[in-house]
Regions:
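Hydrophobic h-region of N-terminal signal peptides that target proteins for export
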Residues: 2-9
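Terminal domain-start segments
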Residues: 9-50, 144-145
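Acidic, small-residue rich beta-repeat scaffolds with periodic aromatic anchors
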Residues: 11-23, 101-145
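Short consensus segments that form the blades of beta-propeller domains
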Residues: 37-39, 67-72
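Beta-propeller blade termini
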Residues: 43-52, 96-111
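Acidic/hydrophobic-patterned starts of short beta strands in beta-sheet-rich repeat architectures
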Residues: 54-65, 106-114
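Short, solvent-exposed loop/turn segments at conserved positions within beta-propeller repeat blades
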Residues: 70-75, 117
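Beta-propeller blade signature
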Residues: 78-82
Length: 145
């Protein structure tokens, strides 16, 4: 089973408590502008707000867009997690479309297939400190770049 967080899912904006919006964007490295929260590429949006690793704390995915920054995929994403002390911390960022797999790394964090155009994608696994490339897959089967 595959949890796909793609552009079709982005159509529904998650309900994020106002008190957390600013801290989520700041943790993702965005700065506030007249048009909204900006990265170096474009105005971003919180596309996912849920407990992604089953620890009882919310996590968020902040996305921004632009082929000048992200090539043919046109999407960048930043995963931020609420810590036990209530603060938010960026865990990972990349260009591409994050596909959360059922396989897991440390602390219940799901492996991420970094999707986009092509036929062989890096799968990142959380090791307790960082998401690192664990393997390459296409449609659930091993592949090589």
């Amino acid at each position: 089973c595959l949890l796909l967080i793609s552009n079709s899912n982005f159509a529904q904006t998650p309900q994020v408590p106002k008190a957390y919006t600013d801290t989520i964007f700041k943790a993702a490295g965005f700065t506030k502008s007249k048009k909204g929260w900006k990265s170096d590429c474009s105005v971003g949006e919180i596309t996912t707000y849920a407990d992604l690793n089953g620890d009882g704390l919310k996590d968020a995915i902040v996305s921004d867009y632009g082929t000048m920054c992200y090539g043919n995929t046109g999407v960048g994403y930043y995963i931020v997690a609420q810590q036990k002390n209530g603060k938010w911390k960026q865990l990972f960022s990349n260009s591409g479309i994050p596909n959360f797999l059922q396989t897991k790394g440390t602390d219940g964090w799901l492996d991420i297939e970094n999707g986009g155009p092509g036929f062989c994608f890096a799968v990142y696994r959380w090791d307790g400190q960082a998401y690192k490339v664990n393997r390459y897959e296409y449609e659930g089967k091993a592949c090589e770049l």
